[in-house]
Amino acid sequence: MHRKHLQEIPDLSSNVATSFTWGWDSSKTSELLSGMGVSALEKEEPDSENIPQELLSNLGHPESPPRKRLKSKGSDKDFVIVRRPKLNRENFPGVSWDSLPDELLLGIFSCLCLPELLKVSGVCKRWYRLASDESLWQTLDLTGKNLHPDVTGRLLSQGVIAFRCPRSFMDQPLAEHFSPFRVQHMDLSNSVIEVSTLHGILSQCSKLQNLSLEGLRLSDPIVNTLAKNSNLVRLNLSGCSGFSEFALQTLLSSCSRLDELNLSWCFDFTEKHVQVAVAHVSETITQLNLSGYRKNLQKSDLSTLVRRCPNLVHLDLSDSVMLKNDCFQEFFQLNYLQHLSLSRCYDIIPETLLELGEIPTLKTLQVFGIVPDGTLQLLKEALPHLQINCSHFTTIARPTIGNKKNQEIWGIKCRLTLQKPSCL
């Protein structure tokens, strides 16, 4: 078998004149395209082009110039543009996202978790406006996050009502100025926040009903700012420090609707702080925690408290070593008392605890550290109608009760959260 030699290609650098003529029968175009599974590009209206991503930022701006279409030169027979045919809406029935009313889109957005809501806010200006609607930002949980204070301020400006943010980090100063927040329930317990930053955030809050600042360092300006929230019902300042008895008096005198107050273990509390607390706490209070003041809480303070707050239901005076069994008569003056905590009040004689069993309304009694383990069972048998040493921790004014899986804040479940979101 003889191989056929390839024809030599002329050298372009030579002087030999060479010309090629390309030709195509336009009648065969449709046959070729059909074999390829495509069709020729149909003419479209100018406004039916797909909007490129880079123009999304211009949506909603009428002054934005329209795009110019390139005009082809020459006749249609010179070349053919081939691309996939545009989907015909008649063959794919449905409703365009652009035609959906705002109310329906808001309903869809309300089913999204926080990461997805942030994503859709970047689609276009309309979606950004809808994703920022205050109805979607009623409850927000950013527990344990490292946040810039300005970001926190912007989020609260969205219309957040319940803000759960314990154990968070906001160790930078607040730079921006914000309009008043609408937040009513806020938990910043055990967070790392600069005093000036905390003051900047709280200064924009005047509608608070429930607030927990447990473990934070405060200041007189912060406490005086809190006094603007006259609708406070629950206030947790357990373990706080940095404010005087004068600021405390201003706060308690202004918050006349308090129902639960936790002032336990405030590090730099003195006898004067305790005296101010019992003399100015709201008369409407039903749950009060004044534990941890050892020698600073006297029997006279208890007498003042009982006279001022006859509606107490839950009272915690644990770690008050100056209280003895001669103060028991004060508890009999509280006609609604159900829960009493006297743990580690070491001057109380264990045998005298039987007297407390005669309080008709009493249901639970916490006396850890007073009754030896050997006689605890005897006490329980002598007072069978009481639950004794049934709880190690207080729940007074605490925002979250139970295990760490509980993501509620005073019974309100936060919808927007970054804690393992379950997106649709």
Curated annotation (Swiss-Prot):
Residues 94-140 form the F-box domain. LRR repeats lie at residues 151-176, 177-204, 210-234, 235-257, 258-284, 286-308, 309-330, 334-356, 359-378, 380-401. The modification Phosphoserine is found at residues 64, 72, 75, 179. The modification N6-acetyllysine is found at residues 68, 71. A motif (Nuclear localization signal) lies at residues 67-73. The lineage of its organism: Eukaryota, Metazoa, Chordata, Craniata, Vertebrata. Substrate recognition component of a SCF (SKP1-CUL1-F-box protein) E3 ubiquitin-protein ligase complex which mediates the ubiquitination and subsequent proteasomal degradation of target proteins involved in cell cycle progression, signal transduction and transcription. Specifically recognizes phosphorylated CDKN1B/p27kip and is involved in regulation of G1/S transition. Degradation of CDKN1B/p27kip also requires CKS1. Recognizes target proteins ORC1, CDT1, RBL2, KMT2A/MLL1, CDK9, RAG2, NBN, FOXO1, UBP43, YTHDF2, and probably MYC, TOB1 and TAL1. Degradation of TAL1 also requires STUB1. Residues 1-220 are annotated as: Mediates interaction with hepatitis C virus non-structural protein NS5A. This is S-phase kinase-associated protein 2. Keywords: Acetylation, Antiviral defense, Cytoplasm, Host-virus interaction, Immunity, Innate immunity, Leucine-rich repeat, Nucleus, Phosphoprotein, Repeat, Ubl conjugation, Ubl conjugation pathway. Pathway: Protein modification; protein ubiquitination. Part of a SCF(SKP2) complex consisting of CUL1, RBX1, SKP1 and SKP2. Component of a SCF(SKP2)-like complex containing CUL1, SKP1, TRIM21 and SKP2. Interacts directly with CUL1 and SKP1. Interacts with CKS1. Interacts with ASB2 which is the substrate-recognition component of a probable ECS E3 ubiquitin-protein ligase complex; ASB2 is likely to bridge the formation of dimeric E3-ubiquitin-protein ligase complexes composed of an ECS complex and an SCF(SKP2) complex. Interacts with the cyclin-A-CDK2 complex.
